[in-house]
Every structure is written in structure tokens, then in C-alpha cells.
Amino acid sequence: MSGLTVSIRGRNGAFAIEAGFAAEGGVTALFGHSGAGKTTLLKMIAGTLRPENGRIAVGDFTLFDAQKGINLPPEKRRIGYVFQDARLFAYMSVKRNLTYARWAGHRQATRSFDEVVALLGIGHLLDRRPSTLSGGERQRVAIGRALLSDPALLLLDEPLSSLDHARRQEILPFIERLRDESHVPIVYVSHEIDEVARLADQIVLLSAGRVTASGAAADIFPLIDAESEGGGVLLEGIVSAYDERYKLAEIDLGGASFQLSDAGLKQTMHVRLRVRARDVSIARKIPEAISIRNLLPVTVTGIERGEGPNAHVFLDFRGRRLGARLTRRSVDDLGLSVGDQVVALVKAVSVDRAAIREK
């Protein structure tokens, strides 16, 4: 088994969908506004809604192929599905909910019960009923149940949408462990930018039932940033040094570095940083005596002027895209044009703690 390949067209009532993308593994986020077609696409992958034509496969395991007449029923697709609500059996203990998945899957186990329980940190919950669990605990059990069915693919349909912020922060580290340690490809549906920034290896953008862009998270995230106040770009780096006196970590981005105030980072740790366009300023040259620590040499690659007071300036940093949201007046005052060599000033707060992850 390997990654997921989707190339389909179909309908859900009057709603038409046309989707094509390939995901190599890890977490593939389906991102779009409400009504974009995320859940419809997930249902077609799961087999509960039939496309009109096309093909869906996980590696060399074909789930649907209209031309060859293949349309496996949901129970034959080896897919673990986690919904917005946990959908646990209320009359069963947590342990029985988990073991039921193994029995219902009718497949030889590739992961031990104890391994899954340890991965999700639910050992202390085994004798409890779902009604006594918090929302985050119920979702962790639901993920464990899906994983114990020995899936070739996991589908997570907005699994955190019913949780408050505290419960989301509680469960996100376990989903990260699932991504990093289970080796099962995951399709993650969300309209929350923060979750996508933290979890996704690949992003598929959906709008009105069509895939508008897909690819590596670092490449696709700037497209979200250009349209959203909450977007940004993702930069991967490694902690190259740590200053104990000032509690500052230095992140090597390959030819440049960021300083990040975070006592939890350790040397040689691989991290992902998120930089929002609203937190990036531009200078013609490196300013003197400035409190901002993170300065990057960049090239202006594009300027998009809206009808309002703001403009979005597209920047290139050693082959990686950045963005800066400036006023149109600032763009004119700086005399910015495509090809200019300038300096991006990144405020310390724009390095999002929630977007940092250990690889």
C-alpha cells in the first residue's frame, strides 16, 4: 500500500463534484469553506456515495474504477472513518468498543491492541463508558477504534469541530503522533486553518465541488494566505542553537535563521513555522537598532492590489514563498515593483506556537 490517488466526477443531488489529486502519505488536508464539497468527496472515497466515473485507489489497491466496473462496498475498502461525533457504542466499555473494531474488520491485525492504546494515551479509559468521557477522550477512542480495524486509509471528517479550544489542544498532539507513527495515510477534512497548518503534509483546496489547487502544504498554504486574514506560509527548519540566557531558539531555515522564544524546543529538533502575511513588514534595507529579530532577504514576485486599502505583496525567500499584507499607500511609498530585492521583517508573534511540530 502507498498513497491515495483520486480522479473522479460525480453528483450528490444537485451538487456536482470534480476532483483529482494524488497524496503520497502522511496527512492530506481537504480544505475549503462550508459547502465546498469536502464531505461529499470523503463519502465517495469511503464508498457511501458512488461517483459517475473516474478512479480511486490506495497504492495498487483499487477502490473504484468506473471503466473496469470496480466499486468496492464500504466494508471491503479497508477504510477507517472518524466522524465529527465519536459514534461510540454507549452500552459498551471503551475496551469493548476498541475490540469490536478488530472483530468487525475481519482482518489479521498489523497493530497490537496495546500499541494503539499507548499511541493514543487511552489506557486509563478502558473500563469506562463513553458517557463518562470528555469530548477529546471520545474522539481519541474513536480514532483508536478506526485504527484497530487495520485500515489502509484513515478518513477524519472534521474530528475536532465539536470540541472547544482546550479540548482541541488536548487531542492535536495525539493526531500528530498518529501521523508520525502509524504509517497509515490520513485524509483530514477541516475548515480550520490552524489545524491544517499544524497537521498537513499535503493540502487539497476545494471550492464549489472542484479542486482548485493541491500539493505540498508549504506550496499551497500561501494561496490560502492571499485570501484569508488567518492564513500564512509554512517554513520548515531545524533548531540549530538555543540561548539559555534569553530562552531563544535559533531555527536554521537554510541560509537564514529565525529566533523563536520557546523553552520547549531542543537542539536538532525539526520544526514547522507559520508566518502570517499580516505580521510581515517590508523595508528597502536592513534597519538599524530595531527590536524585530527575524529579518529575511526576499525578492518581490508579485503585487495584488485589492479594491480596499490593502495590497498583498508576494515574496520569494530562497525558492520559498512568503507574503506581506501592506496598505496600498505603503506599497506606493516604498515604490515596490516585481523583481525588487527587499527585506522582510517578521514579528516574533507571527511565529505561531500552535504550528510548531516535532518530526
From Swiss-Prot:
Quote the InterPro entries the UniProt record gives.
AAA+_ATPase, ABC_transporter-like_ATP-bd, ABC_transporter-like_CS, Mo/tungstate-bd_C_term_dom, ModC_ABC_ATP-bd, Molybdenum_import_ModC, Mop_domain, P-loop_NTPase
Which GO MF terms are attached to this record?
ABC-type molybdate transporter activity; ATP binding; ATP hydrolysis activity
List the catalytic activities from the record: molybdate(out) + ATP + H2O = molybdate(in) + ADP + phosphate + H(+)
Binding site residues for ATP: G32, H33, S34, G35, A36, G37, K38, T39
Task: Assign the protein's first listed, main location to one coarse class.
Answer: membrane
Keywords (alphabetical) are:
ATP-binding, Cell inner membrane, Cell membrane, Membrane, Molybdenum, Nucleotide-binding, Translocase, Transport
Gene Ontology CC annotations of this record: plasma membrane
Do the record's keywords include Cell inner membrane?
A: yes
Q: How does it sit in the membrane?
A: Peripheral membrane protein
Q: Please report the stretch or stretches of sequence annotated as the ABC transporter domain.
A: 1-233
Report the EC number(s), separated by commas if there are several.
7.3.2.5
List, for all copies, the residue spans of the domain called Mop. Answer: 289-355
Name the Pfam families on file: ABC_tran, TOBE
Q: Where in the cell is it found?
A: Cell inner membrane
Q: Which family does it belong to?
A: Belongs to the ABC transporter superfamily. Molybdate importer (TC 3.A.1.8) family.
State how it assembles.
The complex is composed of two ATP-binding proteins (ModC), two transmembrane proteins (ModB) and a solute-binding protein (ModA).
Q: What does this protein do?
A: Part of the ABC transporter complex ModABC involved in molybdenum import. Responsible for energy coupling to the transport system.
The protein depicted here goes by the name: Molybdenum import ATP-binding protein ModC
Q: What is the scientific name of the source organism?
A: Brucella melitensis biotype 1 (strain ATCC 23456 / CCUG 17765 / NCTC 10094 / 16M)
